[in-house]
């Protein structure tokens, strides 16, 4: 019988002998690995063991199968390994086997301990006395690679870096000093914090419309309430998001080239852009931009104020989305049915109903 186990308590050697006992066996071999008190001249206090439990037990059972295939006469096999902290002189691993003859027992135990060190994923850390640094390490006999074979060896390829403070201006994206950059970051964080606070007030704070409580000093933290949403396990309102620029909307996106040609004053349908340009050559480019930005055009208005309106429109579009208007403006799909119109039913009074019934009766008599 095979006895395989990872234990956190001290291993009882007497219990191991009981597991090996069998009337038909004339020999039992037991290997006990203990914690020694020194390593490379450093004082060892204890050993700490960790393992990948499921994989370790699987490999230990495979070792038992290998032992029985090589030595079929083996009766009982025991493989116990400690996990956690193991003080000095305590057993950390016990491997034992019983068989009718001593040669099978001795050879199988020697083979098992070598396979355990090689195949089972168990790591240990030596805890030293004093300020010596401890680290986790695997058995040196392990067949698992310590590092990827395809990893690049940076130590074999030294790289010399020449320090230079003259950086080309084309490679610099942010051309401000540290104080200005810190100020911008603080403003961004504060604005995001204000948005979150305002949303928390909307989602959590009740209005207390009919209450006489003074709310001048109240806040969302002290006045918050949780309102159960219908057909939902969440107390926050769930809103459907219309993803207008996702991958599923590729077919509904407009023709970018056509939109850009409109912006540049190219030919569009039956209109002649050169004819329009000859009519008002100084304002043609600005008029095209204003038309594309959906701004009202007034030729008598000052050109600087018109340019200012265009700049404000661009800033507005950039604040809404990094993409511009012609990237997100979608044409209505012909496959989609128009939303049903809400029809409000008319309420009839009693005299109106009586008059309507009377008309029906008169019509039937006439027929």
Swiss-Prot record:
- Give the GO molecular function terms: molybdopterin synthase activity
Q: Which cysteines are cross-linked by disulfides?
A: none
Residues bound to substrate? 101-102, 117, 124-126
Keyword field: Cytoplasm, Molybdenum cofactor biosynthesis, Transferase
Cellular localization per UniProt: Cytoplasm
Look up the record and give one Gene Ontology term from the biological process aspect.
chromatin remodeling
Which pathway does the UniProt entry assign to this protein? Cofactor biosynthesis; molybdopterin biosynthesis
Catalytic activity reported = 2 [molybdopterin-synthase sulfur-carrier protein]-C-terminal-Gly-aminoethanethioate + cyclic pyranopterin phosphate + H2O = molybdopterin + 2 [molybdopterin-synthase sulfur-carrier protein]-C-terminal Gly-Gly + 2 H(+)
Keyword Cytoplasm part of the UniProt annotation: yes
Example GO CC term: the record gives: cytosol
Q: What's its top-level EC category? A: transferase
> What EC number(s) would the UniProt record show?
2.8.1.12
Q: Give the similarity note.
A: Belongs to the MoaE family. MOCS2B subfamily.
For this protein, the record's PANTHER family field holds: MOLYBDOPTERIN SYNTHASE RELATED (PTHR23404)
A further note on this protein reads: This protein is produced by a bicistronic gene which also produces the small subunit (Mocs2A).
Instruction: Give the protein's biological function.
Output: Catalytic subunit of the molybdopterin synthase complex, a complex that catalyzes the conversion of precursor Z into molybdopterin. Acts by mediating the incorporation of 2 sulfur atoms from thiocarboxylated Mocs2A into precursor Z to generate a dithiolene group.
Q: How does it assemble?
A: Heterotetramer; composed of 2 small (Mocs2A) and 2 large (Mocs2B) subunits.
Could you tell me what this protein is called?
A: Molybdopterin synthase catalytic subunit
